[in-house]
Amino acid sequence: MKTAPIALVLALAAIATGCTTTENSSRNLGDPSVHGKTLAEQVCSNCHGVTGNSTNPTFPRLAGQHEWYLIEELKEFRSHNRLDPAGYEYMWGLSRSLTDAQIQELAAYFARQKPGADQPENAKLENAGKAIFANGIPSEGVPACTVCHGAEGAGSGQFPRIAGQHADYIVKQFNVFQRSAEERPNGAAMKVVAHNLKPEEIKAVAAYVSTIASK
């Protein structure tokens, strides 16, 4: 049966992370006639939140992300080209039966949601991150984050939105970029940047970025 492995993946994810699911939502994943908005509300919401503003930093905030980027990443998960642990643990099974139309609809749904952000907690750390974000670290070969992601972290037609993303998730992705060229095949620029940043610098940038509110 086509939906049994998917239901198993959902059940395992629920046990491991506290995400909840239902029999009906797992069935919907194998049905190409189900609209992406329905999948977003009944399936994706279990981990990412109904509005794409997840409360668990294991799962990224999707609200306000560029539609093109969400489409690209969902297709990378579906084709198993994205090899980071979160990819194969959670997204491979969930995305494998998605149609192109459903991916488009999911991306459009989350792209139009209002993004959130974390409240500032550590001014010293966040200010250090803000300086790197705005100016880079020329002596270490690190360009300003604004060059690609914009002054407010909103991204562009080539680079994703990072403003308001969970700090822990950002750190995790930096670690992925540092670890292997294969895990995130579309992140050539970030691989160079990540290798030139120290752990404390990554933590500072992540802390600042997580507090950038929507503009």
Regions found by a protein language model. Give the residues of each.
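C-terminal motif of bacterial Sec signal peptides marking the signal peptidase cleavage site
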Residues: 15-18
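Electrostatic cytochrome c docking/interface patches
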Residues: 20-40, 53-58, 112-138
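Post-signal-peptide N-terminal segment of Sec-exported extracytoplasmic proteins
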Residues: 33-68, 75, 79
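Sequence context surrounding c-type heme c attachment/ligation sites in exported
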Residues: 37-41, 45, 134-146, 155-157, ...
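The canonical Cys-X-X-Cys-His
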Residues: 44-50, 106, 142-152, 205
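Axial heme c-ligation environment in periplasmic c-type cytochrome domains
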Residues: 55-61, 77-121, 156-161, 180-212
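Extracellular/lumenal glycan-associated surfaces
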Residues: 65-68, 73, 160, 164-166
